């Protein structure tokens, strides 16, 4: 079937979205697919970094998180190549692999583990599994063995062999990723792209409508209710004045979507004492003390009363630059709270979810010369500016329940007289002192955007009896066209 336009029209579940939105979803899903803990050969053989602008004749595409294989024949083998191991001792030997997609050297993958074939009778692509450890398609185990029925592949199917996930894409079909797959991938999608879905309307709507996000928000609300009584000494003590104007006028500080992720389990500290010895010019700040040092090993069974948002804020404020990497946030929490240092639960996941969900935190580029990949985290410019403006105006009242980030900012400001900020921040913290500052701050909030890595653009045309033309451009989009 001939192609009359570069953008094929589809009438499927994503038809109301643009081709760019649909491709953005495929890109996002591909980038969060799992790979083996050890390097696999296909990641180097067909690495995305090796792609150059050129035309490729291909029937379809199979893509992992960091590699792309173009299907150029009617049968593709997947397995573990062993010839290169036997010929390494011969200098100058050119190794011709007998496997198309090499998932070695891990022996969990058989030498010939699977094959993807085009069935001329049915006109469909099928996956046959030979390896004893089997495989999954769309997160469900499929029949294994040479006599077992093959599994028909649709465009958007996610294949998992030996812990290496890959997505199968056809040009003649709309690439549909099943809801079941999206539910499995939702924690990674949310952690990587946030509730905004990397500014992709389709991905954003999928994340917002997910059961996972709804459950996360319900858990946050439940944890907030559990934390209510912890704030009672701070908000209702008769011998402590509320924080605000020295003349007694108070204005409640509003804050967007603060999340208190206090988790179940562990032993709560029994008593908390408040002291008015730390009064400052801007108001009396009660100092909350734990009954003992929670960093000591002996207190490993005592769950800290601080929420994850509070501990993240403490970690950020502990740095002179006001920004910190995710790994250093983990280290700060482990060093200061023995409960998490000895905990077997995946509390790091809760930290990542807080960073993604809480608008008080945002990413910032790492400092020049700072080691490690990824970005740093800081207090958002909007939250910092709102806090400092109200502090300088003397209009901070007693902290409302759930405002964990504000509480930590207030305690830090009372003790040190300033809030650290990274160089890229639009707010200059140097002029902020513990005394009431009459000069108002005028700053604009900088919003950092990150573009997700994208699949390579492929233009597929022609008949199944002949190979099809495919434009390959690094970090471009896939334009679905027609194959029959």
From Swiss-Prot:
Which BP terms does GO give this entry? chromatin remodeling; donor selection; G1/S transition of mitotic cell cycle; G2/M transition of mitotic cell cycle; mRNA 3'-end processing; negative regulation of pseudohyphal growth; negative regulation of transcription by RNA polymerase II; negative regulation of transcription elongation by RNA polymerase II
PROSITE patterns (UniProt xref)? FHA_DOMAIN, FORK_HEAD_1, FORK_HEAD_2, FORK_HEAD_3
Q: Where are the transmembrane segments?
A: none
Q: Which GO terms describe its cellular component?
A: cytosol; nucleus
Q: Which residues bind DNA?
A: 302-393
Pfam families the record matches: FHA, Forkhead
Q: Where is the FHA domain?
A: 76-142
Q: Which GO terms describe its molecular function?
A: centromeric DNA binding; chromatin binding; DNA replication origin binding; DNA-binding transcription activator activity, RNA polymerase II-specific; DNA-binding transcription factor activity, RNA polymerase II-specific; DNA-binding transcription repressor activity, RNA polymerase II-specific; RNA polymerase II cis-regulatory region sequence-specific DNA binding; sequence-specific DNA binding
Identify the InterPro entries for this entry: FHA_dom, Fork_head_dom, SMAD_FHA_dom_sf, TF_fork_head_CS_1, TF_fork_head_CS_2, WH-like_DNA-bd_sf, WH_DNA-bd_sf
Q: Which UniProt keywords apply?
A: Cytoplasm, DNA-binding, Nucleus, Transcription, Transcription regulation
- UniProt entry tagged with the keyword DNA-binding: yes
How is the subunit organization of this protein annotated in UniProt? Interacts (via FHA domain) with ECM30, GLN3, URE2, MPH1 AND FDO1. Interacts with the origin recognition complex (ORC) composed of ORC1 to ORC6.
Q: What else is known?
A: Present with 1720 molecules/cell in log phase SD medium.
Note on domains (UniProt): The phosphothreonine-binding FHA domain is required for the interaction with MPH1 and controlling recombination donor preference during mating-type switching.
Protein name from the UniProt record: Fork head protein homolog 1
Gene that encodes it? FKH1
């Amino acid at each position: 079937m001939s192609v009359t336009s570069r953008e094929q029209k589809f009438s499927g579940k994503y038809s109301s979205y643009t081709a760019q939105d649909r491709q953005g979803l495929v890109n996002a899903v591909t980038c969060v697919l799992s790979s083996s803990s050890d390097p696999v050969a296909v990641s180097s053989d067909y690495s995305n970094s090796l792609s150059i602008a050129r035309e490729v004749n291909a029937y379809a595409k199979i893509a992992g998180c960091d590699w792309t294989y173009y299907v150029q024949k009617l049968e593709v083998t997947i397995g573990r190549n062993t010839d290169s191991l036997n010929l390494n001792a011969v200098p100058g030997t050119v190794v011709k692999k007998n496997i198309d997609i090499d998932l070695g050297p891990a022996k969990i993958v058989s030498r010939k583990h699977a094959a993807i074939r085009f069935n001329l009778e049915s006109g469909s692509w099928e996956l046959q599994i030979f390896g004893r450890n089997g495989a999954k398609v769309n997160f469900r185990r499929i029949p294994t063995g040479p006599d077992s029925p093959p599994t028909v592949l649709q465009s958007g199917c996610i294949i998992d062999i030996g812990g290496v996930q890959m997505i199968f894409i056809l040009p003649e079909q709309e690439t549909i990723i099943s809801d079941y797959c999206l539910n499995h991938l939702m924690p990674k999608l949310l952690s990587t792209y946030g509730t905004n879905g990397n500014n992709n309307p389709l991905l954003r709507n999928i994340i917002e409508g997910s059961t996972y996000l709804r459950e996360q928000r319900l858990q946050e609300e439940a944890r907030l209710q559990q934390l209510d009584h912890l704030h009672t000494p701070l908000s209702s003590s008769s011998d402590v004045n509320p924080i605000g104007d020295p003349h007694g006028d108070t204005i409640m500080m509003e804050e967007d979507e603060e999340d208190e992720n206090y988790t179940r389990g562990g032993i709560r500290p029994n008593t908390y004492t408040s002291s008015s010895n730390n009064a400052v010019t801007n108001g009396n700040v009660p100092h909350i003390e734990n009954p003992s040092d929670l960093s000591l090993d002996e207190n490993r069974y005592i769950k800290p009363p601080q929420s994850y948002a509070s501990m993240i804020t403490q970690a950020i404020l502990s740095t002179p630059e006001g920004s910190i990497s995710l790994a250093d946030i983990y280290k700060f929490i482990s060093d200061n709270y023995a409960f998490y240092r000895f905990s077997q639960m995946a509390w790091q996941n809760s930290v990542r979810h807080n960073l993604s969900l809480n608008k008080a935190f945002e990413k910032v580029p790492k400092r020049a010369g700072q080691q490690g990949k990824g970005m740093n985290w800081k207090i958002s410019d909007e939250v910092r500016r709102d806090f400092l403006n109200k502090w300088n105006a003397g209009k901070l009242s007693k902290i409302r329940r759930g405002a964990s980030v504000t509480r930590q900012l207030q305690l830090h400001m009372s003790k040190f007289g300033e809030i650290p900020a990274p160089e890229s921040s639009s707010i200059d913290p140097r002029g902020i002192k513990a005394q009431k500052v009459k000069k108002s701050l005028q700053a604009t909030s900088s919003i950092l955007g990150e573009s997700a890595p994208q699949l390579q653009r492929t233009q597929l045309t022609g008949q199944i009896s002949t190979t099809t033309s495919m434009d390959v451009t690094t970090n471009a989009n896939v334009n679905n066209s027609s194959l029959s």
